[in-house]
């Protein structure tokens, strides 16, 4: 039974909220962001019928984590995106508390969405349904309904289906929490997307030597890359280390061998996917030219998100830039999408003076052991020395300084700046640090320890969703 439509309220929220968001000095000029309300996980990232599609978790009615819809953008070139009709709203009993994250597939020429229907009970507790929806001729979507109930042996925290085709079968990984409150990744297979068979647990507590690795693993994504398979996921509750896993919830990757017949993934150690302050729930897709692309939510659940100043203008959060993945000699590399170079203006050398903070790309070559720093408007500071990088940012709740770290020999930095975000690519993508920051309109980028001949920058043209 369908619930009452909230579409009129959503349209009113967009009409009233969009002008405020676009006038905000912190609103991005070339990243994806909501025109009103709260945005979080990227969903359904796919190339289909000559277009790229990126769906995302969106609450258009408030800047909080209620009423999760699937909003939708599309593009022909990965640079210029346009708004599409809302794909999914929580208007059925099986998804009444949110159309949670998932993926998209091409099912014999039909764009099909696989998502989690979230249901919370008045007396406490919850359940989850894995659901399907298919695209109509007019670009809207028709819900098929649940195809997989809550698996036996797990709490109501089972979600985020990532589905793909291999040979004659569909496969799905799900993030899960077992009844002992331990994080797991589950594997299922199907011949038709409707009837699913459990193939067991492939990662998490008690698997491949892992012990205390969190109480819930979210947003899994398993894919081949180079000579290995890569599993990306978000282990909630993993123990903090002195300089690693410092965010409220981190995102990690692990490489290994995946056996389809046995339903087994033999992987190595966990690695943090992004060492910055804001990065979560990444999702990948394979392009027709063979590239594995990634996009993440430049946010973190809880933490200080509800103190961000954009709340005053009715919007919160943005996506990362799109990234290309490679796996070389045991290392996962993330590089900025090559198409982003089309946004560059004229190349500039550096005179040694401060630069006005504005959307730009910086290319900085370093010598191992160089001591240097970049100060982003007195709000965010990047320091480099022989041990690696330290990113410092003042808390939004107090005057306390918070830090994030990347350790290793720094040879080069590519820094991508937008109105309220910085993404730092280290050594050609060997490491990444992604962070939000909220400078004054007159903020400047200042430098220390940098020689002009090692520095080049390009202003970046505005390229907003239409």
From Swiss-Prot:
Transmembrane segments: none annotated. It catalyses: Hydrolysis of terminal non-reducing beta-D-fructofuranoside residues in beta-D-fructofuranosides. GO terms for biological process: sucrose metabolic process. Pathway: Glycan biosynthesis; sucrose metabolism. It is found in: Cytoplasm. It comes from the Bacteria. Its EC number is 3.2.1.26. GO terms for cellular component: cytoplasm. Its main location: cytoplasm. GO terms for molecular function: beta-fructofuranosidase activity. The keyword Iron does not apply. Belongs to the glycosyl hydrolase 32 family. This is Sucrose-6-phosphate hydrolase. It comes from Salmonella typhimurium.
């Amino acid at each position: 039974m369908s619930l009452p439509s909230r579409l009129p309220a959503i349209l009113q929220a967009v009409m009233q909220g969009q002008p405020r968001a676009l006038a905000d000095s912190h609103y991005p000029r070339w990243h994806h962001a909501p025109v009103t309300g709260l945005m979080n996980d990227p969903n359904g990232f796919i190339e289909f019928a000559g277009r790229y599609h990126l769906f995302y978790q969106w609450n258009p009615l408030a800047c909080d984590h209620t009423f999760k819809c699937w909003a939708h953008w599309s593009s022909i070139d990965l640079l210029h995106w346009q708004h599409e009709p809302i794909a999914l709203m929580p208007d059925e009993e099986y998804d009444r508390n949110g159309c949670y994250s998932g993926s998209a597939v091409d099912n014999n020429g039909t764009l099909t969405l696989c998502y989690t229907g979230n249901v919370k009970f008045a007396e406490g507790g919850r359940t989850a349904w894995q659901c399907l929806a298919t695209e109509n001729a007019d670009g809207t979507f028709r819900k098929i309904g649940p195809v997989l109930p809550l698996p036996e042996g797990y709490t109501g925290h089972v979600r985020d289906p990532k589905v793909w085709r291999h040979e004659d079968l569909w496969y799905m990984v799900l993030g899960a929490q077992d009844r002992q409150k331990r994080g797991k990744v589950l594997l299922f297979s199907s011949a038709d997307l409707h009837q699913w068979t459990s193939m067991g647990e492939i990662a998490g507590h008690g698997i491949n030597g892992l012990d205390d690795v969190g109480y819930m693993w979210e947003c899994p994504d398993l894919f081949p890359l180079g000579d290995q398979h890569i599993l990306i996921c978000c282990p909630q509750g993993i123990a903090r280390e002195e300089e690693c896993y410092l965010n409220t919830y981190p995102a990690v990757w692990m490489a290994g061998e995946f056996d389809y017949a046995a339903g087994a993934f033999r992987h190595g150690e966990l690695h943090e996917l992004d060492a910055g302050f804001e990065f979560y729930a990444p999702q990948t897709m394979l392009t027709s030219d063979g590239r594995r692309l990634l996009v993440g939510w430049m946010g973190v659940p809880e933490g200080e998100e509800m103190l961000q100043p954009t709340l005053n203008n009715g919007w919160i959060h943005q996506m990362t830039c799109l990234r290309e993945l490679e796996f070389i000699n045991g290392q996962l590399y993330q590089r900025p999408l090559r198409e982003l170079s089309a946004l560059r203006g004229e190349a500039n050398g550096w005179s040694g003076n401060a630069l006005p903070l504005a959307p730009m790309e910086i290319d900085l070559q370093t010598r191992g052991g160089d001591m240097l720093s970049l100060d982003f408007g007195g709000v965010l500071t990047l320091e480099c020395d022989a041990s690696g990088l330290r990113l410092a940012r003042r808390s939004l709740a107090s005057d306390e300084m918070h830090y994030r770290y990347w350790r290793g020999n720094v040879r080069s930095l590519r820094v991508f700046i937008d109105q309220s975000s910085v993404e730092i690519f280290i050594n050609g993508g060997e490491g990444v640090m992604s962070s939000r920051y909220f400078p004054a309109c007159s903020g400047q980028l200042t430098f220390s320890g940098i020689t002009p001949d090692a520095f080049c920058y390009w202003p970046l043209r505005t390229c907003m969703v239409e």
